[in-house]
Amino acid sequence: MSITVEEKNRVMTEFATKKGDTGSPEVQVAILSSRIATLTEHFKTHKKDNHSRRGLLKLVAQRRKLLDYLKGKDEARYNVLIAKLGLRR
């Protein structure tokens, strides 16, 4: 239910603000979004997996906190990120 190393590296290179960037809010939110998408697919076939559902809710809350932080620090970067990820339709 986790993402592969290749997928994680792809996301990091796509959203990195500079070379070797692994900790910026953009990268963290993108990785969390990838994990959330993976878990969402998992729940389409495993509807009663409540242990993993709790983990999904924790990931969503963590992503929300990072997005709130980014919006407070730099709203322009926040808007670019949510547009790139397709969040907040």
From Swiss-Prot:
InterPro entries: Ribosomal_uS15, Ribosomal_uS15_bac-type, uS15_NS1_RNA-bd_sf. PROSITE patterns: RIBOSOMAL_S15. GO terms for molecular function: rRNA binding; structural constituent of ribosome. It comes from the Bacteria. The keyword Ribosomal protein applies. One of its GO terms (cellular component) is cytosolic small ribosomal subunit. Keywords: Ribonucleoprotein, Ribosomal protein, RNA-binding, rRNA-binding. GO terms for biological process: translation. The keyword RNA-binding applies. Belongs to the universal ribosomal protein uS15 family. Part of the 30S ribosomal subunit. Forms a bridge to the 50S subunit in the 70S ribosome, contacting the 23S rRNA. HAMAP family: Ribosomal_uS15_B. One of the primary rRNA binding proteins, it binds directly to 16S rRNA where it helps nucleate assembly of the platform of the 30S subunit by binding and bridging several RNA helices of the 16S rRNA. PANTHER family: RIBOSOMAL PROTEIN S15, BACTERIAL AND ORGANELLAR (PTHR23321), SMALL RIBOSOMAL SUBUNIT PROTEIN US15M (PTHR23321:SF26). This is Small ribosomal subunit protein uS15. It comes from Paracoccus denitrificans (strain Pd 1222).
